[in-house]
Structures are given as C-alpha cells and as structure tokens.
C-alpha cells in the first residue's frame, strides 16, 4: 500500500534583489509492504523567475524491518558496554539489577528491587544541590571543629600531666636532698662517736682548732662558711689600726679559735665566748684609734702653739734690736 502525503509549499526570499520569491515543492512518497525494504522519495521542484528554471530531486532509500524481528541499535551496544546511561524502562532496570547483583555477589548479595531513581543515582554522576552542598560543608566544619577541640583537650591534658610529673619529680628531688643532708649530719655524728670509741682516731682539740672569722654569726652554726662585706671592711680597719694593745690581740686570737666537743658538735659556750671576745676586741680597737687620733690632734695643736710662740719671740727680739 502506497502512502502519499501532500506537498508543502514554502516561500523564501531570494538573495537577488530583482527576484521576488522562490517556489519550492516537497513531495514525500513512502511505501510499506510485507517485504523487508521500502523506499522514500523526496522531490524538490524549484521554480524561479529567470527563464532557465531548474528542477531537482532528492531520493532516499531506507530499509524497513518486519514487525516480528528485533535488531540491536548502537544505543543498546553502548548501554551493554556501560557507556550510556540507562533509560527508565523495566527491561533496562532488570538488566541493571542483574549487573549490580553480579558485582556485589562477592561481598554481600542483596535481592531488593531497585527503583528507577536509585538506578539512575547508581549509574549517573551525582548532581549536588545547593542545600546538599551546604549541609556537607556544615558537617565537615562541625567535624573539623570537634577534632580541633579533641586535639586541644588532649594537648592540654598531656601538658598538665607533664607539668605535674615535673613538679612531682622536683619535689621528690628536694625531699631526697633533704634526706641525704639529714643522713650526712647523722653520719658525721656517728663518725665522731666512733672516733671516741677508737683511741687511734681520737682528735685532740689543739690540732683541730682552726682560725675562725670573728665577724660570722656564731649563733647559727649552719652559716659559719659565709662572710659579710662589713666584716671585710672591719678587718681592713683593724689592719690599719696595728697599734692595738696586747690584750685586744690576745682576745682576738682566743676568739678566732674554736674546738669540737666530745660528740663532734660545736660548743655553744665557747662560741658565745668567742663572739663576746671579738666584740670586745673590736670595741678596744675603736677606742684605741680614737685615742690615737686625739693624741695626734693634741700633738699638732701643741706644735702649732710652740711654733707660734717661737715666731712671736723672734719678732719681739727683732723689735728690741
């Protein structure tokens, strides 16, 4: 049976300025039968104003397929190769479901049916909306802030633990030092006691006597090794005042010596006596310096008076002459 469709007449402006219109006729004829091929004919008669009118035709032959047969199109081939997104049709969805089940059979096989939207989401690139992107960014920001807080809390905890450990170690070191000091004191006393027991290690007080600094606070035996600046100045002043009496020198020599007791510790009475003797020697030296200064002044005044008298007497003798 032949199907003939009517022609369509179109009027198009020509490029030439003199010509008004170009008449074009399109005739489409198609025939379909039980045979496997059909042909379509397109004829385009063109009429123009010039006398040399041309008429040309286009012919197109297309192969038709019987209704009972099915052929594979390039889209199907691309779909099988995975290069084409699936259409939302039941057979395609079943194929996608089979492929997914085959791929996930190694890990976990799920037989739930896949909706068209889920299949499209699986095989199509995901398109994020602005709301979804904003939510993801918010989640990422919250996670990052929580991680930062967790790290900072851990660092603070570690820092506090280290500081506590350092403080504890310093305290333990101080305690150990104090214990060692106390043990040393007790060991010294024990050694002194043992020296008393053994006559070979008995120490005579005359040999152990040392020269003591008279300007040290004798009441506190722990500060014996320290010296004061004022003590040095007083020592220099005593060196200058070398014309002190023999009593003050003997007192200073007595005060500069101290002895150990029977138990190895310093005798407080001897220390007090030495401190009193040193104070007396200092006072005696100061008084001696004052006396020497006054005697020098008196000698100077007497010499000045004598010189003035001699000068006056010489002047009187000259006047008499």
Curated annotation (Swiss-Prot):
UniProt entry tagged with the keyword Cell membrane: yes
Polar residues composition bias: residue spans: 297-314
GO molecular function: kinase inhibitor activity
Annotated keywords: Cell membrane, Membrane
InterPro entries reported for this sequence: BKI1/MAKR1/3/4
The organism's place on the tree of life at top rank: Eukaryota
GO cellular component: plasma membrane
Location within or outside the cell: Cell membrane
Location of the region described as Disordered in the Swiss-Prot/TrEMBL record: 297-321
Official protein name in the record: Probable membrane-associated kinase regulator 3
Protein species of origin: Arabidopsis thaliana (Mouse-ear cress)
């Amino acid at each position: 049976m032949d199907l003939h469709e009517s022609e369509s007449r179109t009027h198009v402006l020509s490029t030439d300025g003199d010509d008004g219109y170009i008449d074009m006729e399109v005739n489409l004829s198609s025939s379909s039968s039980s045979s496997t091929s059909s042909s379509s004919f397109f004829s385009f008669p063109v009429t123009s104003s010039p006398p040399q009118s041309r008429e040309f035709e286009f012919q197109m032959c297309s192969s038709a397929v019987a209704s009972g047969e099915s052929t594979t199109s390039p889209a199907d081939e691309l779909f099988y190769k995975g290069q084409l997104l699936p259409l939302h049709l039941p057979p395609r969805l079943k194929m996608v479901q089979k492929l997914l089940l085959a791929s996930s059979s190694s890990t976990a096989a799920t037989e739930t049916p896949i909706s068209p939207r889920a299949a499209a989401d699986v095989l199509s690139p995901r398109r994020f909306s602005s709301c979804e992107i904003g939510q993801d960014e918010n989640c990422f920001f919250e996670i990052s802030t929580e991680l930062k807080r967790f790290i900072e809390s851990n660092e603070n905890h570690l820092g506090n633990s280290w500081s506590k450990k350092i403080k504890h170690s310093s305290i333990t070191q101080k305690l150990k030092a104090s214990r060692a000091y106390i043990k040393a004191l007790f060991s010294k006393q024990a050694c002194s006691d043992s020296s008393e027991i053994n006559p070979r290690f008995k120490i005579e007080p005359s040999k152990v006597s040392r020269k003591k600094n008279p300007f040290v606070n004798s009441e506190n035996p722990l500060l014996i090794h320290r010296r004061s600046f004022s003590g040095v100045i007083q020592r220099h002043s005593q060196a200058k005042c070398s014309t002190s009496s023999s009593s003050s020198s003997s007192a200073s020599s007595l005060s500069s010596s101290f002895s150990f007791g029977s138990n190895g510790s310093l005798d407080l009475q001897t220390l007090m006596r030495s401190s009193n003797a040193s104070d007396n020697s200092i006072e005696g030296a100061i008084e001696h310096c004052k006396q020497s200064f006054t005697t020098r002044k008196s000698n100077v005044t007497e010499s000045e008076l004598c010189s003035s008298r001699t000068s006056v007497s010489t002047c009187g003798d000259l006047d008499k002459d």
